[in-house]
């Protein structure tokens, strides 16, 4: 989910600016509803995690991320900005349900004496994901946009195609996260009952 947050926060402005010719300010403002939704769902996710545990919170969150990204990848090339903004809210809602609760669920599996080491590992992997994700997805966007441009697509259309390709790959990663969370959260739920 850390990879999703940082990647989408970089890809979306590139998409809005490259495909629609928007200013950085307008592109940033279009992400604001998703960020606000993320803040709310982070609070909700924390409360649900405290009350019920990881099941069904993590699978639902990853499902929202995956479904939102799949839908964005299918609509981005058609350049329907309202749909992309709405689907971005769905993705960020899923991230809010996953980010902190997944870290809590991971730390809960460790003995108390190991929590500092677990926290250090989580922080390290979060930073790796936050660094790797945008690099990977910007590379995919750029490569795909260049290929589309070389095939004769207009610059704005090529940028939209590149964005759709990058989000499609991110969706595959989210589907893997969903499958993993389904197995993990269900196992944790059965072990606690």
Language-model segment annotations:
Residues 189-193:
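Short, charged juxtamembrane terminal tails flanking transmembrane helices
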Residues 151-156:
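Interfacial non-cytosolic loop connecting adjacent transmembrane helices
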Residues 1-148, 159-188:
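12-transmembrane solute porter fold
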């Amino acid at each position: 989910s850390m990879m999703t947050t940082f990647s989408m926060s970089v890809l979306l402005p590139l998409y809005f600016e490259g495909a629609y010719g928007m200013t950085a300010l307008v592109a940033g403002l279009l992400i604001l509803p998703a960020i606000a939704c993320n803040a709310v769902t982070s609070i909700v996710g924390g409360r649900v995690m405290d009350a019920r545990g990881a099941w069904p919170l993590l699978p639902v969150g990853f499902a929202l991320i995956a479904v939102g990204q799949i839908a964005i990848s299918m609509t981005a090339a058609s350049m329907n900005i309202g749909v992309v903004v709405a689907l971005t809210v769905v993705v960020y809602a899923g991230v809010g349900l996953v980010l902190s609760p997944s870290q809590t669920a991971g730390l809960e599996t460790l003995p108390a004496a190991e929590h500092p080491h677990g926290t250090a590992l989580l922080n390290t992997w979060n930073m790796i994901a936050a660094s790797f994700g945008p690099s990977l997805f910007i590379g995919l966007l750029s490569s795909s946009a260049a290929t589309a441009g070389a095939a004769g697509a207009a610059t704005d259309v090529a940028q939209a195609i590149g964005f759709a390709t990058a989000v499609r790959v991110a969706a595959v990663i989210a589907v893997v996260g969903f499958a993993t969370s389904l197995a993990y959260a269900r196992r944790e739920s059965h072990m606690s009952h």
